[in-house]
């Protein structure tokens, strides 16, 4: 059962996003207890392709990418909140790295 949804809004920062995702998949919480929802906010770079490659390399993790057309991070955060499947939602930015245990 998914207990925690981690939402990451992003806009044209594919390289930073991948680094953030690398830190997310190192979490020590069991994989079936969390999901990560990345919200692409009008990205025009290779965010979608790089996310798809990352997700394919980590099939054991619940990673999803959704698109949000509303301009700005508040639209992206709200979209992520609507997409979240868990009762508890955490947010990080696409340039952040989380330590092990962050999702505990």
Regions found by a protein language model. Give the residues of each.
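Short alpha-helix within the catalytic core of nucleotide-sugar-dependent glycosyltransferases
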Residues: 21-22, 48, 86, 100-104
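Short beta-strand/loop segment that forms part of the nucleotide-sugar
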Residues: 33-42, 64-68
